[in-house]
Amino acid sequence: MNEPTYNYNDFLMPALADGQPDISIEISEITKKQWNQLIGIHEVVVYKDCRKLFPAAKFSVRGLDPALLYSVEICFDVLSPFTFSYNKKLEKWIPTKTPVNCQSSALSSMICETGDWFMNGDMDFGALNITSSHEKAKEKIEQNRIAVCLSSRTMYQIRVVLYEMQNDELIYLKETKFDEMIFITCTEYRGQVNRELKKSMNRFSRKRKYEISGTKCQRSKRPAKLPVESLDEKELKNAEKGIMSLLESSPSSPSYLYQYQYNSPQSIPSSIYDSLYPSSPEEYQMVHTFPQTDQLSPSFQTSPTVHYDFYNQQYYDNSFHENYFQSYNRL
């Protein structure tokens, strides 16, 4: 029996007729730049505990009547009827045969203001909380907070719907979907590029909080494993035991540094399509799922040098950012 084939366009919802051509809804410039950096491999981590959506959802609206009341709703449409799994060999998300167990569209709370208010600033959904628990989302909504429940390993696309308020009724005006705002929910980041970009841009991440406040975040998780395959084990133990004596004898020395090489991608795919489907018959045999629909994106890798400081328990990496430090107890 032949395997069913699915095209990406089959997952997209048909757009409604645009009866308001003079009204435009666009992504704000800063938000658009952040989403474009992550398109193709964009992952959004969702836990039971609520967390902020990053990059934030900010939009600008033009062509409204300044005196009328409007309401804007943000929706999360499910694009694929199947869940996704991450294939480590291919380093990409692959559709599975497991159906999605959630509603076709998850809605958040609305913003209700005048047309003048909408056009003088951005519609900012930066306070939006995402969670995988319906109970947690309900608690936030009862506290007059914006929250939405999303299922894990599911592909979503953000859609914005604009209404006009007349006599306490909502009159549909326009809706807009954004190809930049397509993502897959997961419980942990899989892509190294995605992880590094999130840490460098997201002000809610532990690394960015440390840079802003100057105080390290306490973590209860066990330390990550050191790259012992690149270090001499005996020399590593001796360095840890004698580090204090080494520092006292040479206080001006750079702490006692080791270095090792690793490969880290410096560029990300420019299209989301290349990240979702096998690109050759060989890859199809590896994952036993849908046949190819696109060509494989080229991978860009370099080999920057990373130093590890045993005394301060930090990595120093000069390949991504100048003076970039990452805590030893990292994710």
UniProtKB/Swiss-Prot annotation:
Alphabetized SUPFAM superfamilies for the sequence: p53-like transcription factors (SSF49417)
One GO MF term attached to the UniProt entry: DNA-binding transcription factor activity, RNA polymerase II-specific
GO cellular component: chromatin; nucleus
Gene3D superfamilies in the record: Transcription factor, T-box
Classification via InterPro entries: p53-like_TF_DNA-bd_sf, T-box_DNA-bd, T-box_sf
Keywords: DNA-binding, Nucleus, Transcription, Transcription regulation
Protein's GO biological process: cell fate specification; positive regulation of DNA-templated transcription; regulation of transcription by RNA polymerase II
UniProt-annotated location(s): Nucleus
Keyword Transcription tagged: yes
DNA bind region: 29-210
UniProt key word Protein biosynthesis: no
Protein name, UniProt field: Putative T-box protein 36
Originating species: Caenorhabditis elegans
